[in-house]
């Protein structure tokens, strides 16, 4: 399904509202991170929101940036505004293979895919950020890159791994109960 920006805003606000309800009801008091929501929760929130959006048919990328000693993470919708990175492969060096084998891995004798997203691939994408209020910004931001997100030096972006197990599943289920 293809969503317009207003529908994405609606989904993002609904999900943030569910997080806020769970937080205010004390459902996160036992969680090492979410008991301080939104402070320090941007990465985990990205995984939770990406899972919710994926269930609605919306794919996203996880983006991380740094500003001084601070880091921040947000999603970029994976749609026609985002360009796919050019495929890159390389053969690990003998030293890398030695280290891999030393830690119980198997030596690579074929090229390894090292394709990754660069800032230029995502610069025209739509950002979805539910935790910028930890920096005094709006609690739900959906839009093109703004002054706040430009402050963060691009570190990396990758395809989302969706919540499948562990602590994040528990958090997702808590939030989902408030949707």
Positions of predicted regions on the chain:
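A structural boundary/capping signal
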Residues: 1-179
């Amino acid at each position: 399904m293809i969503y317009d920006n207003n529908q994405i805003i609606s989904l993002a606000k609904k999900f943030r509202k569910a997080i806020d309800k769970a937080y205010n009801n004390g459902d996160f008091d036992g969680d090492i991170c979410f008991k301080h929501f939104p402070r320090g929760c941007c990465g985990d929130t990205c995984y939770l929101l990406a899972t919710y959006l994926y269930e609605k048919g919306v794919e996203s990328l996880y983006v991380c940036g740094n500003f001084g000693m601070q880091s921040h993470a947000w999603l970029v919708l994976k749609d026609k505004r985002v360009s796919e990175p050019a495929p890159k492969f390389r053969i690990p060096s003998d030293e890398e293979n030695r280290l891999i084998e030393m830690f119980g891995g198997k030596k690579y004798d074929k090229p390894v895919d090292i394709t990754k997203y660069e800032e230029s691939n995502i610069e025209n994408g739509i950002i979805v950020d539910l935790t910028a209020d930890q920096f005094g910004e709006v609690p739900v931001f959906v839009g093109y890159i703004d002054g706040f997100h430009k402050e963060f030096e691009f570190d990396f972006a990758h395809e989302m791994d969706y919540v499948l197990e562990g602590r994040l599943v528990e958090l997702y289920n808590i939030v989902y109960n408030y949707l």
